[in-house]
Amino acid sequence: MRLGLLSLLGLCAASPARGQSLSAADSARHVLNRLAFGPAPGQIDSVAAEGALRWADQLLTESRPADPQLAHREAAFSPRQFEADALAERLEEARRDRQRRQQADSGMAERQPPRMTNGPGRTLAEFQQLAVVRATSARDQLREVMVDFWTNHFNVYLDKGLDRALLPEFIEQTIRPKALGRFEDLLLATARSPAMLFYLDNVRSVRSGATPPQLARLEQPRRGRFGLGRGIRRDSLLARLQERMPTGINENYARELMELHSLGVDGGYTQHDVTEVARILTGWGMRQPNRGTGFEYHAWAHDEGAKTVLGVSFPAGGGEAEGKRLIQLLANHPATMHHVSRKLCARFVADDPPDGCVDDAVRAWQATHG
């Protein structure tokens, strides 16, 4: 969200609801609980003396302050471990960790003392500690609140396979840099995030009949002398790859994208729209972890046929660009503005937003282009 919309919500949070009369201390407590992670010692008195409206206005309109003390504390958590180029090592440890847990569950492994490693378990534990440090120590409380808000809005389940290793990067490299920016940019970033694409199975969503290049090469007839052993090994590898490869469209991400991330459950879309969105997003995948992960578009997997979403036509042959056009359509749809604005009002103003709050937020969204 641009700060214009947040400013409106912040001022609403600092103002008593109609028919209510709050003391200066109560107003200060309310705004600190909404725009920050609660009051620090002595802060209720200082905000009450300044005035909750004035404090909220300054918080939302001033430039984001440098925070050297927080930066010093963050450095203790080795931020590099949350970046993409450190992912291959974490994923290898995740694979070993998964094998150990599977063996333990099946009774095959002897009981062993916990191992302190740099794997996903330790990374997640440190990442959770870092979140607490930021929430309690950051001068820019609004950014931390928005990171928390968007992390919940664009939920990723950390106990699904690779997402144990991908989640920290998702929050640090996808959510955090865009937490105070335009919604369209954030929606696109999450749509291209390996954590999201893996969690909701879009990495396995391909057009019907699609054959990945590595499988196509193995399926080609070979000429020349071929030892029997090599031929058997090749056939075995081909069979394993064919068994693991996706075979068609997966609608999981398409449905969540519309129902939770943008339009809302009552956003006016149909099952046909879900299928068409899934077709548009075929080929949106991720690089292999041993190559550093990151978004990767697979043209071989994309459905190049014509599609229609919410009455809008997407001509045949649109490729990756039609996915970006889809995100733009969803991000700026009136239903999305209403759905996301209601959630923002519930977070920043009141659990049950007062009359007019959502409509005011939508108008601010329109005025600032999200």
At which residue positions do the language-model features occur?
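Bacterial N-terminal signal peptides
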Residues: 2-13
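Mature N-terminal segment immediately following signal peptide/propeptide cleavage
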Residues: 20-48
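N-terminal accessory alpha/beta regions
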Residues: 41-153, 158-169, 173-178, 199-203, ...
